[in-house]
Design a protein with these regions (language model features):
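Hydrophobic face of amphipathic alpha-helices that form TPR/SEL1-like repeat modules
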Residues: 1-27
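Residues at or immediately preceding the N-termini of alpha-helices
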Residues: 26, 40-43, 62, 80, ...
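Conserved C-terminal structural/oligomerization subdomain of aldehyde/semialdehyde dehydrogenase
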Residues: 28-34, 218, 255, 310, ...
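Residue-level signal for inorganic ion chemistry
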Residues: 29, 65, 87, 109, ...
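Glycine-rich loop-to-alpha-helix module at the N-terminal edge of alpha/beta enzyme cores
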Residues: 30-119, 130
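Short, well-ordered beta-strand elements within core beta-sheets of diverse protein domains
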Residues: 32-38, 53-59, 145, 254-257, ...
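Rossmann-like NAD(P) dinucleotide-binding subdomain of oxidoreductase/dehydrogenase enzymes
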Residues: 77, 121-266, 319, 395, ...
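ALDH superfamily catalytic-core signature
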Residues: 228-375, 438, 487-489, 493-499
Length: 499
């Protein structure tokens, strides 16, 4: 059986801790590989080597660093299918969805080709008599990215691009559930010209995470995952003086107004709610139709669409709408929450319980579920399910609908479907959520805008990619310079204003 190790100093290396985790094929339920789990000693060695490599990389001309990003874009395009196939095999998502995973990461690397412009400083001449003042952006040094299972290409690339093009070295700790693609990305970075040691991929579990958080060398940590772990990482990183950017869970609401195109809204809900088996932090998991008539008509349109969804392995190609969830534990958790919805009184309109696929009975497949008449006190409303489950909460008015989204503890993404501009503008201005869609169900910003949630979906004041990506991985230094005229002067004892 294949054993996956780490990427250290420009090559794949075997783990030395003797500890491993199983890597499954979610479609079959079989263990297809084992991944090494790093010890603290392995991690510390990788960090020390990264710190040494960063010295020269940080001093490299920003345009030369940008050329590495440019070459990487070409290599990602060249190996798109290879990366997507490996991603689908370990994660379970369909092949087209896996290609989208790589593509959205690639787009951030494209944006990072413009790093020299983003890193330019500011200059003021004659700030005082014979005095010039300028500010510069400098890399932090060694930074870390701790990335999730659901986007094993996109999120590592979102972290790597701004960090590396800003002159940092990075310790990447990907999910141990689907570790192949991050290792492949590291190989492509080397082929693109990234010096050895500047990117270290260290596979591991909590021992590696805690080692990153406690390291005195690592200056910043970026994380994407669940809210409890995001809070843990944010608090522990901050306690050791690190800059932290931690993104957690979501419960994204889509409000459907009475004037909305309900066919369009139903199509949007099916794609946004069930794509990738619901394992997306930007998935729509709560539909909020306004008015009983709107709700009845929406359910009527949703049911046949959901019942037609095709669930199967990625090898079936275009014949499949979504694949399995990532682990047996994830499947069991979804089934538990679905049953809680039934027990607490929600109406299960489309019942995917007991779903089984011939030939793949041991796979981690979950049938599609649609709930109606869900109320805010139910677990399926409060909890991020991370599965193919859509909950419908009926609202009597627009104010009630927006109030539901505002009062929920998560604030990652949201959407409203309406033909009325005043309603859309009011919603966009009042909602306390980080990413908002107007007739767009999954409002993931493009690479040159920032991505980030509010409330318990995001911890830290700087977001991912866009301008915030460069701000997070750099710090400013301001220099005040004065060149003596040659006339000897006495010491100054007062803090004088510049005149």
């Amino acid at each position: 059986m294949e054993e996956l190790g780490h990427w250290i100093n420009g090559k794949r290396v075997a783990g030395t801790s003797g500890r491993f985790a199983d890597v499954y094929n979610p479609a079959t339920g079989e263990v297809q590989a084992k991944v090494a789990l790093a010890s603290k000693e392995e991690l510390d060695s990788a960090i020390a080597d990264a710190a040494e490599a960063q010295k020269a990389w940080g001093a490299t001309n920003p345009q030369r660093r940008a050329r590495v990003m440019m070459k990487l874009v070409g290599l990602l395009n060249r190996d798109m299918d290879k990366l997507a196939e490996a991603l689908s095999r370990e994660h379970g998502k369909t092949f087209p969805d896996a290609k989208g995973d790589v593509q959205r990461g690639l787009e951030v690397i494209e944006f990072c080709i413009g790093a020299p412009q983003m890193l330019k400083g500011e200059f003021t001449d004659s700030a005082g008599p014979g005095i010039d003042m300028y500010s510069m952006r400098q890399p932090l040094g060694v930074v870390a990215g701790i990335t999730p299972f659901n986007f094993p290409a996109m999120i590592p690339l979102w972290k790597m691009g701004p960090a590396l093009s800003s002159g940092n070295a990075m310790i990447l700790k990907p999910s141990e559930r689907d570790p192949s693609v991050p290792l492949m990305l590291a190989e492509l970075c080397q082929e693109a010209g990234l010096p050895d040691g500047v990117l270290q991929v260290v596979n591991g579990d909590k021992e590696a995470v805690d080692g990153i958080l406690d390291s005195e060398v690592i200056q910043a940590v970026g994380f994407v995952g669940s809210t409890p772990i995001a809070q843990y990482i944010y608090e522990r990183a901050a306690a050791t003086g690190k800059r932290a950017q931690c993104f957690g869970g979501a419960k994204n609401h889509m409000i459907i107004m009475p004037d909305a195109d309900l066919d369009q809204a139903a199509d949007a809900l099916v794609g946004a709610g069930y794509g990738a088996a619901g394992e997306r932090c930007m998935a729509i998991s709560v539909a909020v139709p306004v008015g009983e008539e709107t709700a009845d008509r929406l359910i009527e349109k949703l049911v046949p669409r959901i019942e037609k969804l095709k669930v199967g392995p990625y090898t079936a190609g275009d014949a499949v709408d979504y694949g399995p969830v990532v682990t047996a534990a994830a499947k069991a958790n979804i089934e538990r929450l679905v049953q809680s919805g039934v027990d607490q009184g929600a109406e299960l309109v489309v019942d995917g319980r007991g779903f089984s696929l011939q030939g793949y009975e041991d796979g981690f497949f979950v049938g599609p579920h649609l709930f109606d008449r869900v109320t805010p006190d139910m677990d399926i409303y409060k909890t991020e399910i991370f599965g193919p489950v859509l909950s419908t909460v009926r609202a009597g008015s627009y104010e009630e609908a927006i109030g539901l989204a505002i009062s929920h503890e998560y604030g990652n993404g949201t959407a409203i479907f309406t033909r009325d501009g005043d309603t859309a503008r009011d919603f966009a201005n009042r909602i306390n959520i980080g990413m908002v869609g107007i007739n767009v169900p999954i409002p993931v910003p493009l690479a040159y805008h920032t991505f980030g949630g509010w409330k318990k979906s995001g911890f830290g004041d700087l977001n991912q990619h866009g301008p915030d990506g460069f701000r997070f991985y750099t710090r400013t230094k301001t220099i005040t310079s004065r060149w003596p005229s040659g006339i000897k002067e006495g010491g100054e004892f007062n803090f004088k204003a510049m005149e």
